[in-house]
Structures are given as C-alpha cells and as structure tokens.
C-alpha cells in the first residue's frame, strides 16, 4: 500500500483519528458534556482552539469525542450489514433456483428505495438513539453486499476446484465456507472500506434531520445541526464538525480505492 501514496496517507490519517478517539479522555482536558454558560460562544483561542458552543462546551473536545460516535457507527452497522449480505449472497449464488430468486427480489426491493429514507422510517418507528441507528443502518445496507457476493459466488461455483469438491461428496457448507468465501474476501475488504463512509454520512444526515443521535451526544451531525443558527456569527461551530466528517469520509474512500487497485491484479487472476 506504500506504493499508493494517497491510500497510505489516508491509512495513517485513519489510524491517527482512531487513536485520538480511543484516547480522547487522555488527550482532552475538558469534559465534552460539561456546560459553562459564562464561556458560551467564545472565539477560538489558546484555551479553546476551536472556541466553544452555545452551552460553553469546548468544540475541539466534542469533535474528538464525536470521532468515537462516527467511527463506531461507521464500523458496527457496516460489519452487521455485510455479515447479513454475505450470508444471503453466498446462499443465493451457490444454491440458485427459488432461493436465489426470493433473496434477490427482496434485495431489489430494498435497493429500490433510498437507504436514507428507509433508515428514517426505521428511526421514526423505533425512536432516536445510537442503538436504533445501528439497527436501522444494518437493516437497510445489506442488499448491495448480497448482490456483490452473489455475483462472486456464481463465478466461483464454476471453478474446477469447487466442482471437484462437489464430485467428492463434500457437503455444501464446507464448500461455501472453505472454498467460496475465502475467495470473496478481497472483494469484501474493498467493499467494507468503501461502505464505512456511507454509514458515517447516513448517521450525520439522520442526526441533522433530528432522528439520529440525541442531545447531548457529541455527534458530528448533531453538532452541525445545533450550530447552524450560528453559521454567520460563529462559523467555526459548523465548519469544524463538517470538515471532520469530510476528512474521515475522504480518507476511507481513498483507502478503499487504493485497496481496490492493489487487489485488482489478484481479482483478475482469480
């Protein structure tokens, strides 16, 4: 990955962001939830590099703690949705027939609706909160993974080593998890990396629309919506979390593109 400078730089950036999120309690000297009305809407200074919000909370501290929320929401729902999509894609591609038809038609229905709209419906039904965000994003994002894995499985099922395993009487589960799934991993790695930004943006959008993270959670999307009325008087309150979202999303996208370029020769050879 060092040969792709942009992807390597993005990887370093992601590692630094993760370290900041993990050690936020050590790095930050302020509590992200402690209010101080006498310090509200302070301009950037040495004590508060990005100023303070309308409740006197340090903006930089809330952005660092907000990285925990964004990365967690980027990783956990993506892992869950990819697990669901991978299992369904493997089953549909390997067995075919009516099973394939039912799973893929259900996936088509899910893909026919905007994922953000479906997530909003789920959130309105279950209510706000981080756990419900995990559930909503996991339920609406599995379909694209299932289609990709199904396509890979259809191709791999025709390989000689798979046909040989079938002729030797190896059971289907062993063939799927020993011969088919391992060869899908390079594609899944790239797909996973490129899916994380989508989940982060979805969480930010849901929070911005008022159905995602709830106050006083230090969420980047929630910080943007809380500070939008100060856009012209205290623009850093809006720009800081917006730029944080942009940096993380771009870093994961560039890393995903780099991994795709690295793994592309392997995928073509396979």
Name what the model sees in each region:
Residues 57-72, 76, 96-104, 154-158, ...:
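Amphipathic cytosolic juxtamembrane alpha-helices at the membrane-cytosol interface
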Residues 49, 53, 59, 83-85, ...:
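Generic hydrophobic transmembrane alpha-helix motif, especially the helices
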Residues 1-86, 90-91, 97-98, 112, ...:
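Gly/Trp-centered helix-boundary motif
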Residues 9-13, 73-77, 103-106, 119, ...:
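Hydrophobic core positions of alpha-helical segments in small-molecule transporters
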Residues 17, 90, 119-124, 133, ...:
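Transmembrane alpha-helix boundary and packing residues in multipass membrane permease domains
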Residues 24-32, 93-97, 122-128, 140, ...:
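Short helix-capping/hinge motifs at transmembrane helix termini and TM-loop junctions
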Residues 17-18, 82, 108, 124, ...:
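Residue-level recognition of pore/gate-forming positions within transmembrane alpha-helices
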Residues 123-125, 137, 152-153, 201-244, ...:
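Glycine-rich helix-loop "coupling/hinge" segments at transmembrane-helix boundaries
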